[in-house]
């Protein structure tokens, strides 16, 4: 099972997209994020395995079965924790770059 520190920004992006657009296909998600369909499939399967996302079948307008991706309550909590982790990481990177720039100006 993945630890909260092992999730990637792609996992986080996918959780946000699924929360707002549960009927999107993996292909559409991949196009929106600019990553491969295989990567999206891998991330979604990982999120399903840890219980952050559930899959439900639905019948779409073309008489085919599709999936609805549902962010679980556990997934909603994890999404906030992962987002906070990335925010802290980005803040640290910003401060490091800021210090490099100001040190080189001195």
Please provide the spans of the model-predicted regions.
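Short, cationic-aromatic polyanion-contact patches
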Residues: 2-11, 25, 56-80
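Alpha-helical residues within the helix-turn-helix
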Residues: 31, 48-49
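Amphipathic alpha-helical dimerization/coiled-coil segments
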Residues: 77-106
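Key DNA-contact positions within bacterial/archaeal DNA-binding proteins
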Residues: 27, 38
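Pre-recognition alpha-helix immediately N-terminal to the DNA-recognition helix
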Residues: 12-16
